[in-house]
């Protein structure tokens, strides 16, 4: 029941955004549908479900959402090599992001080798922002309070520099000449959790070419009211890298923290999925009882 409802809703959403997709030559107007989060440790299961969902929705502006887990990375490569659009989600660290970019590039190369149309494949790499600050700020000692609220933006700016390096390389240029699109960074979780900072801090600081920003209504409304649209993402990269070094010197283990954020993110996805399935099951049972009572 859930799958049928989800596919129906996603088809409608994709059709609604179809004009945007076609008007931008397939650059924008995408809708994402995630695989069952319980498949996050199952490469084969992720690939199988992604193929099924992509075929069932049958819309060119659909992205299949796959988490950036050790099992998800090879699935991403396979899906891209089959021409399936992918939204890689739950990226927190630059190390994982490097694996994500490699999976995308390798997938495009495989698709090119079999004569596939690279211009029809799109992908975004969803880098989660505010949760990084929440995790790191809570780990800082009293003497390091001056570092609060800066780590997520520094992490994202460094990741964007990684993006620029990868997608200006000769390896990628060969693919681009055959019609390939860059895998755009997508900034997710951009609402500010700390009331001591501007409510548009993350949006203002992460504006750059070839990026996407998803935000809740409250953040969007705040940005419309007092946001400052400038190309900020490429500014102060040296300061960002210096901050990340200071975080390490302060005793914060970034890899350990971001690994935990991934685990916590997967649990949140799975819990939401399970709750939805339970609600549908309970509603179905109630309707069946009502139907039997009326017969």
Enumerate the language-model features and the residues they cover.
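Catalytic alpha/beta core domains of metabolic enzymes, predominantly
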Residues: 85-218
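Catalytic cores of large soluble enzymes that bind and process phosphate-bearing ligands
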Residues: 2-9, 13, 41-45, 89-92, ...
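Acidic, low-complexity intrinsically disordered tails
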Residues: 290-295
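Conserved, mostly hydrophobic/aromatic
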Residues: 33, 64, 79, 216, ...
